[in-house]
Each structure stands twice: as structure tokens, then as C-alpha cells.
Amino acid sequence: MPQSTDLPAWRTLSEHFKTIAPRHMRDMFADDPGRFEAFSVRLGDLLFDYSKNRITRETVATLIQLAEEAGLREKIDAMFRGERLNVTENRAVLHVALRNRSNRPIRVDGKDVMPEVNRVLDRMRRFSQSVRTGEWRGATGKAITDVVNIGIGGSDLGPKMVVKALQPYADPRLRAHFVSNVDESDLVEILRPLNPETTLFVVASKTFTTQETMTNGRSARAWFLERISDESAIARHFVAISTNRNKVAEFGIDPRNMFEFWDWVGGRYSLWSAIGLPIALSVGMDRFEELLEGAHFVDEHFRTAPFERNIPVLMGLLGIWYINFFGAQSHAVLPYDQYLEDLPAHLQQADMESNGKTVDVEGRPVNYSTGPVIFGQPGTNGQHAFYQLLHQGSMLVPCDFLAAAESHHPLAEHHDILISNFLAQTEALMRGRTTDEARQEIASEELPPERLEALAAAKTFPGNKPTNSFLYRRLDPHTLGMLIALYEHKIFTQGVIWYINSFDQMGVELGKQLAKTILAELPGDAPVASHDASTNGLIRYFKSLR
């Protein structure tokens, strides 16, 4: 198959870009009173407004043509059919099956996976309910008060983000903690205030060989046994989420306390699976299933909506427009909701691990940019950190703004202030401020003319900075499921158009392999000369400091 740059629509977009690049969105809004209606989509109570983008109707039509030429519709259908889209690992890509609330058969190698998915969901329900009601007791007969999830990457970021986002729905009697970093400080500080008699550990690793997770898991096990000197007590305080029953048993966890998932679930897409057990423990299985239902709602939208009204397709195409034609290298995710504090970190992994690729699915080097750097903070914190660069920096950074119309905690005028900032920032990024407008603002200041001109220049905002806005009634489990699925399918859309495999992560392997070699060289005082001069020098200096 040809690469993206060989597609006719790509060449058309290259020419079209020359006419769009000089235009300002101020003028686009002035010229088109129906711009908001033309460039916004409603899905349930969620509004996706993409009118503040450097696009015209012709731009959108040509981007959709690009998606069609890249075979996006066929790839969407192939994913939902269970075809092996992860070509390097020869695996299906079926996180959509995990939230398939229609129970429509989805087959891998001819076998319907839905009975197994539902069986694990039933086990999650029974287990989480028994812990939450106090029926499941620790080895000394006390109810569980703290759950410690030990995982990394997709076994940590997704569940941690969702637990934080759904904190208003959490059972206050059951506290959730997350340990990911192999830095011992992470584990030590989490464990310090905990009572082993009332602590449940969830060790989450697909292979049960992940170095960081297993190191933390073994240390947690040792901490527990130092305080409760009874190996049999492990069965009441440790459960596993894995695909590797033998390794779970070797670790000392009863395989009956293992929750399975499958190799067609990528780690960064796994929060919908048993990896989401900490979510079910925190907010209950009913809420977890509402999360699944929200994601399934978006899955059906992605699968069936025409591209011109398909939110994740439009999100992906807009990203292509800025990355490959405007030269953008980053994308900001800016939730005006403190409960979504961890969403940018989750999407950072989901996007950058998926689309940070330089070869296509046939192994050929790509000659165009692919995945951007994803970053963000909640509003209004980000306004006092990096928005200066967004407004007046030399780099173009497309932004997503997310906000709920209703707060979980109505408190004086807090929420109106928050939303006024959400709205003002998107307007300011679009409109900017001309130098003439800046001169008028400072005209009353008694300064020499040259100082006034310099100050006016400093107060000029170029504007024309693209943003998408997501506005919804309230951040509840259903809405959160929708938001996450929208971004997942945006990533899929871009991967298809770039003709890359969004579902492997070979880039994480080389450093891990080298770390094993270096780990064996760190003990003792023997000189190390097997690496480059810099690495050898760093190892020597590390040894000298110990």
C-alpha cells in the first residue's frame, strides 16, 4: 500500500495549505456566521466544538477524502471484526470487545471472545462486591480498608486516572493507592501509614515478568510477611491480574485469586479489562459498567457515524492537518476539571506509545512526522505555568479544552470562574490581540514613544492558535468512558492514515535490555569498560558515590 504522502488527497492538502496558512481565524468567523454550527458535533450531552481551527469546509472535505483513501472505514470494520491489525505481534486489537455492551459476537480466530469477557466481568463483580461489603476479610478477620495497585504503564496510568476522576463516586471506607516506579521511595511512602491486616495488594502485569512491577511486588510481599508471619495469609491479601498463571503461582499468589485478560488487549488500552479491578473496588462494579457503557456508546458512534460527523475521526484528521502540514510537534490536553488531573498523563502514554513510530506496517521508513508530544495540566493551573508559550511562543501547539457544565461540589462562584477561564482561553487563543489594540490599551500610560511601542509589541498576541472544546453536563462514569474512547479512536485514526502499527511498543525494549546488562555491572568495584565513554564514566562515578 502507498504511504500517506503518495495519496492524492495528501497532495491536494499540500496545495490547499498554501491558501489556508495566511488566513486568520478572526476573518474566518467574520466571513461565516454559521461556522459554529458547521464545525461542532453533539453526541449525547457532549458537545465537540472544532470551529476554532484553521480550517474551511474545503479543508474538512479534503481531510475526509484522505481518510477514505487511506482505507480508514475498512480498518475500523477490521478492528471490530477481530482481525490481526497488530501485524508485528500478529495479534487482534480488541479493547472494544471489553466494553461491548451489546454482547454482539466478536471473534478471534473464529472463537467468540464475549463469553470469556463476561466471565471475567462477573468475577470482578463478585470479588469487588465482597471486598466493599466487608465479606472478604483479611487473614486476621478485619475488613479491607486500603487497596494498593502495583503496576506500571497501562497497568497503572489508566486505572489511576479513572479512580481519581471518579473520586466523587468512591467508597470513602476503601482507599486506593498506586505504586509504579521501581524507585523504592514510591513503595515505601505508600506503605508507611498502612496496616497490613487491612491492606489488599493488586499486582498487575500481563506477563508477570515486568521488572518494576515484580520488584515492587516482591518488596510488598516481604513487607507484609515481616508483619504477619504467615505465608497462608498471602491468599487473603494479594490478588493478581495477568495472563501468566504459572508465574503468578511462582510468585506465591493463589491462581484462584488471578483475574485474566488476553493478548489482544494492549496495556495502554486495558483499563476496561481486569486491569480496571481497582476502579471496581473504588467505585463499585455498577459504576465500572457505566464507564464501559460510555465507551461502548462512542465505539458505536466511531463504527457507524459518517466521517463528517464522527468525532474521533475529526479529532484525528485535525491532528494530521497540524502535524503534517503546519509542522506542529506537540498537542496540549487541558481539562478544566481537577478530577481529570491525570488524564494528560494517561493520554501521553496512549498516544505517544501508540504512534511514536518511524516505520510503516510494511517496515519501510516513513518520510513524514507521526505522533506528537502530548502534555497538559488542569485549568487554571496550566494558565500560570505554560500558557505563555501557547499564546505568544514561536511554536504552534494545538490544544484540547475539556469542561463540565456542572460541578460535583457547588461552592460559591468557583465553577463559574473556572468556566469563564475555559471559555476565555479558547477565545484569546483564536482572536489574539493586534498591536493597534495593544496600543489603545496602554495609551494612557505616560511613557516615551519608543517604550510605548516596545510595550505594545510585548502585549501583542498573534492569535490564530487552534483549539478543540469538549463541553458536557457532568463528569460521571459514562461521560468519562466516552472521553477516553474518543481519544483512543483518534489515535487509531491517525495510525491508519500514517500507515503505522499503533499497537506495538518496540521502543520500550532496547533500554530495558541494556539495563539488565548494566544491573549486573553495578555491584562491586570492578572497572567497567564495555560501553561508550559516557556510560562507562557515569557507572564509575556512581560507584564512587556509593
Curated annotation (Swiss-Prot):
Q: What does the record give as the reaction this protein catalyses?
A: alpha-D-glucose 6-phosphate = beta-D-fructose 6-phosphate
Question: InterPro entries under this entry?
Answer: G6P_Isomerase, G6P_Isomerase_C, Phosphoglucose_isomerase_CS, SIS_dom_sf, SIS_PGI_1, SIS_PGI_2
Q: Which SUPFAM superfamilies match?
A: SIS domain (SSF53697)
Q: Which UniProt keywords apply?
A: Cytoplasm, Gluconeogenesis, Glycolysis, Isomerase
Q: Which residues form the active site?
A: E353 (proton donor), H384, K512
As given in the record, the signal peptide range reads none
Its Gene Ontology cellular component terms are: cytosol
Keyword Zinc tagged: no
Q: Which GO terms describe its molecular function?
A: carbohydrate derivative binding; glucose-6-phosphate isomerase activity; monosaccharide binding
- What does the UniProt entry say about where the protein is found? Cytoplasm
| UniProt pathway annotation | Carbohydrate biosynthesis; gluconeogenesis; Carbohydrate degradation; glycolysis; D-glyceraldehyde 3-phosphate and glycerone phosphate from D-glucose: step 2/4
Q: Which PANTHER family match?
A: GLUCOSE-6-PHOSPHATE ISOMERASE
The family annotation for this protein states: Belongs to the GPI family.
**Name assigned to this protein:** Glucose-6-phosphate isomerase
The taxonomic lineage of its organism, from the top, reads: Bacteria, Pseudomonadati, Pseudomonadota, Gammaproteobacteria, Methylococcales
Give the gene symbol: pgi
